[in-house]
Amino acid sequence: MRLTNVTSMSAQRILGNNTEDVDRESVRLASGDRIYHAAYDPAGLAISNKLRSRLRSMQQANRNANDSVSMIQVGEGVLSSVHEMGARLKELALQSSNDTMGDSERQMADLEFQNLKIEIKRILGAAKFNGQNLFDELGGKHDFQVGINNDQKADRITYDMKKVLKSADTVGLGNGSIATKGQSHKVLYPIDDMISEVSRARAVLGSMQKRVETVSQGIMIGYENEMASESKIRDIEYVLLTANLLISKLKQDSTIAWLAQANMESKNIEKLL
C-alpha cells in the first residue's frame, strides 16, 4: 500500500519557494541591481531603461557642450592675438604720424605694419577647431547640440561666423599703409574700428561661452536628478535586502527541518504497516 505524504509535499513546495527567494535575494545583493531580471519588476525595468537612455544622452550632450566651449576658447584665443597685433598697429601708426620720423624710418615701420596686416589675415583664415573653420568665409554656421532632442531653439546653440566677426579683409585694414605721414593719419580711425570690431567679437564669443557653460550646468543638474530617480527604481537597499535574505534563509532552514521530520514520520508509519 502506497501512502501519500501530504505534509512532505507541502514542505517541498514551500522549500522550493523559499529557495527561490534566497536565490533571488542573493543575486540582487551580489549584483547591486534590484531588477536583475525583467520578471522581477517589468514596469520598473521599462522606466529604468528609459531613464538610463536619457542619462547616456545627457552625458553626451554635456560632452558636446564642453567641446563647444573648447571651440569657442580657441576662437577667443585667436582674437586675443589679433587684438594685440591691432594695438601694435596703432602704435606704429602713431609713431609714423610724428614728424620726428624720417622717410626711411617710416618705410621700416610700414614694413612691420604690412607684415602684421598679413599675419592678422592669415591667423583668422587659418583658425580651425578639429578641421572646422572659425572665422573665414568657409566657416559659416556651426550648431552646438547641447540638448537631447531635436528642438532647434531648445537643444542647439548656433555659432555664426558672420555675426561674430567681419571678414578677415576688413579686419586686416585692406590697403592701409603708414609709409607717409598722411597715410599714417588716415589709418588711425580704421585701426580703432578694427580694434573695436575685434573687441566686440571677443565679447560675443565670451557671452556665447557663458551661455554654453550655463547650459552644461543645467544638463548636469538634470542628470543628477534623473540619476537619483533611476537609482531609486533600480538599485537595491542593502540593509533591507540583507534582512530579507536572512529571513528567507531562516525560512529555508526551518522548511528543511520540517521536510525532514515529515519524511521521518512517513517512514515510521510505513514500518508500522
Which residues does each PLM region occupy?
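Parallel, heptad-repeat alpha-helical coiled-coil signal-transduction segments
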Residues: 16-23, 49-60
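A short, polar/charged loop-to-alpha-helix boundary motif
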Residues: 242-247
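C-terminal catalytic core of tyrosine-transesterase DNA break-rejoin enzymes
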Residues: 224-225
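Amphipathic alpha-helical coiled-coil/heptad-repeat segments
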Residues: 1-10, 20, 34-37, 49, ...
